[in-house]
Amino acid sequence: MTTRWPRSLSCLIVTALSSALLVGCGEDDDHGRSCSGRTGKDLSSRTVAGGDLWQKKLRCVNLERSTLTGLVSEANLRRGNLYAARLVGVSLENVDLRGADLRRVDLGSATLSQVDLRGADLSGARLDRGLLTDVSLEGAQLDTVELRAASLTHVGLNGADLVGADLAGATVSDSDLRGARLRDADISTTTWENVLCPDGSRSSARNSCADHPSRAESRAAGQFPAPSAALPDSP
């Protein structure tokens, strides 16, 4: 026996299912991460002058898809959401961006000085022609980041993930890349000046970090065997 639903009820069910599918698969999921259990100031999708952020404590601020202009100085934007924000040509000085979401951010030709980006996510970000000095990027996610023709001086990249990054024409000097992952990164035309390479060796005029990947990456590529397990002591 076939059960026949009233037409009004059938339409209601179809509408509900369609709405659920749109919510689950639509473009609304294309957003940055917000702080768990905490809501910061909402400055999303607008133009924000750097002076408005001067010396402000805006932890967990929402700057998603916003355009920042001018100089941003002495601001605490820790764990902020800057997903797909536009900061082209902006100057960042003494800014705390630890743990921030900067995926797909555009920092082309920007100047960063004494900026703390430890643990931040800059996947797919653009920093081409950027000037980075005294910047902390330890443990940051930088996969597929664009750093073409950028200048990096006194930059900490210990343990950073630079898989698939583009550093063509970039200059890296007096920086620390120990433990950084550079698999599939374009570093064929990168200049290395007094840099601690991923494997701990130091670059020189004849010694490029392109030839000194981290030990984990070298083992994965079969360049040298993994350390053998210790044998138990004889009774």
Where are these regions (language model features)?
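Bacterial N-terminal signal peptides that target proteins for export
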Residues: 2-13
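C-terminal motif of bacterial Sec signal peptides marking the signal peptidase cleavage site
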Residues: 21-24
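N-terminal processing/targeting junctions
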Residues: 15-19, 231-233
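Serine residues within intrinsically disordered or low-complexity segments
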Residues: 8-10, 18, 228
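C-terminal "tail" modules appended to repeat-scaffold proteins
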Residues: 1-2, 235
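Tandem repeat scaffolds
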Residues: 26-234
